[in-house]
């Protein structure tokens, strides 16, 4: 199961007593600010959680799996996430949930 923005909003509504509208707006504003920073080429550092970085990938050769034809994979910029030490430690020490 995945955590959704709707579930985050619901959690803020329940725990902080925000209205549902304010909770949803807070979640949207948070992600919009992360998105804006990355679009502007900035690193996003969330203390105790991790860092979102941008990485430029060079053009490289590829192959069409259907035809076997050689095709170039264009250069692009990708977002990477590196978890912080606190997050890594908590995940490693968490007991697995049954699905």
From Swiss-Prot:
Key words of the record: DNA recombination, DNA-binding, Transcription, Transcription regulation, Translation regulation
Region of interest (Disordered), ranges: 51-71
GO cellular component: cytosol
PROSITE patterns according to UniProt: HISTONE_LIKE
GO BP, one annotated term: positive regulation of metabolic process
Pfam families, per the entry: Bac_DNA_binding
GO molecular function (one): structural constituent of chromatin
The family this protein is said to belong to: Belongs to the bacterial histone-like protein family.
Subunit field text: Heterodimer of an alpha and a beta chain.
Record function comment: This protein is one of the two subunits of integration host factor, a specific DNA-binding protein that functions in genetic recombination as well as in transcriptional and translational control.
NCBIfam families on file: himA (TIGR00987), PRK00285.1 (NF001401)
Record's protein name: Integration host factor subunit alpha
Organism: Dickeya dadantii (strain 3937)
């Amino acid at each position: 199961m995945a955590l959704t923005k709707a579930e985050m909003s619901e959690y803020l509504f329940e725990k902080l007593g925000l209205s549902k509208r304010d909770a949803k707006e807070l979640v949207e504003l948070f992600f919009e600010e992360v998105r804006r920073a990355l679009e502007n080429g900035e690193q996003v550092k969330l203390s105790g959680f991790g860092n979102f970085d941008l990485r430029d990938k060079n053009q490289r050769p590829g192959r069409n799996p259907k035809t076997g034809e050689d095709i170039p994979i264009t250069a692009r910029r990708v977002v990477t996430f590196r978890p912080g030490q606190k997050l890594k430690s908590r995940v490693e020490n968490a007991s697995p949930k049954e699905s």
